[in-house]
Amino acid sequence: MDAIRVDGLVKTFEGFTAVDRISFTVEEGELFGLLGPNGAGKTTTINMLATLLRPTSGSAAVAGFDVTRDRDAVRKSIGVVFQEPALDGRLTGRENLEFHTMMYGIGKAERRRRIDEVLELVELTDKAATPVDKYSGGMKRRLEIARGLTHRPKVLFLDEPTLGLDAQTRRHIWEYVRKLNKEAGVTIILTTHYMEEADFLCDRVAIMDHGTFVALDTPVRLKDTLGGDVISLELEGDAAAFLEELGRLDWIKRSKRHEDVLSLTMEKGERRIPELVMLAQQKGVTVACVNLRKPSLEDVFLHFTGRTIREQEASPGERNRSMMMGHGRR
């Protein structure tokens, strides 16, 4: 059964199309990723599925409920962890969860049991009585995730759950997210602009750019569409003659240039490096750096869009609760 079904979903803001006719399904128990740069339409998509924004056109159902006609039923079926913090730093971790569960009308004894359960799940039991102001960034994100689970949602939306965290803390959050999905069986929709995050966590990934899907499949299959090895050459000098010569070589499957870095896909790349460097020198081009690796989701994004993903900082105050206040009740 599909936990989410989306058909031709569109969202426009004063003539600007943020989401442009996307269609997809997410199976129950799946961990589905929306991958793309900031401004690609990921958060707008999440906000429509979470009933915080009304679609301009198209349809979507979450947990079997239409996001336009059955908004209350959808909201009871989902949990949402926003990019922007939504915790009260003056309260303890447990008090934050108490306040949240009271809003769902859960009885006192059941509240206590569920809170204990989610605190243990995210390994914050020993910090439950500590004010959230004293939590690290990673602990706050774990508590945000715990809060999104206290009412036992069928679907959990995580909007950039590791944004702004260091690499080690991000990896810890990944482990908690995977645990929720595999052990608790929660269907998870994750937005991210971290390629390695989507690759590590997601069963399937939709790559978004300018409001549309440019690719959708498992991370393995997406990378397999490129095949072979990827050689990246950092070039110095006028490379026009070199690039023209490369175009005549039938063993180069595909090439993409981004600024001074040329990415070439081919079989048995390690054997071709000396030939490529020599050819560049013959054409008056200096190769400052050479890198050989297997294709990544970054290469997939570059292949479908012609550019690399941009790690821009999200502007504070946008999306999330401002959208909920400004658009959620329309």
Segments and roles (model prediction):
Residues 152:
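Conserved catalytic motifs of ABC-family nucleotide-binding domains
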